């Protein structure tokens, strides 16, 4: 009987130990997914630095399934706009964030 009691107690504590481990949560920092940076080319149709907008007639953009069209992009703080003017052919990168197309980088191209 004593042996049976020892086996029962051992089993009970083993089950409790495994259950405690199963309920332990590892609260590791989850990295947020980086937004997709999309590259495109087009022609600048207008620059409005006051409202932080640039209008570009861009070629089709397969990454977001967009046809060729003219649209406004939001100029972000890291965007260097010093040499960009209306009529320039440009290569640019942007991030789509909801309804906003956030310009990340833009360069005059040939």
Curated annotation (Swiss-Prot):
Coiled coil: none annotated. It is found in: Periplasm. The cus efflux system is composed of CusA, CusB, CusC and CusF. Pfam families: CusF_Ec. It comes from the Bacteria. Its main location: periplasm. Gene3D superfamilies: Copper binding periplasmic protein CusF. The keyword Metal-binding applies. Disulfide bonds: none annotated. This is Cation efflux system protein CusF. Part of a cation efflux system that mediates resistance to copper and silver. Binds one copper per polypeptide. Residues 1-21 form the signal peptide. One of its GO terms (molecular function) is metal ion binding. Keywords: Copper, Metal-binding, Periplasm, Signal. GO terms for cellular component: periplasmic space. Induction: Transcriptionally regulated by CusR in response to copper and silver ions.
């Amino acid at each position: 009987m004593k042996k049976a009691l020892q086996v029962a107690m051992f089993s009970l504590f083993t089950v409790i130990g495994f259950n405690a481990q199963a309920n332990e949560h590892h609260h590791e920092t989850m990295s947020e997914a980086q937004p997709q940076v999309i590259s495109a080319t087009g022609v600048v149709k207008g620059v409005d630095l006051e409202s932080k907008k640039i209008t570009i007639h861009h070629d089709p953009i397969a990454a977001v399934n967009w046809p060729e069209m003219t649209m406004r992009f939001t100029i972000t703080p890291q965007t260097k706009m010093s040499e960009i003017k209306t009529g320039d052919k440009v290569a640019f990168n942007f991030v789509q964030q909801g309804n906003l197309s956030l310009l990340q980088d833009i360069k005059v191209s040939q």
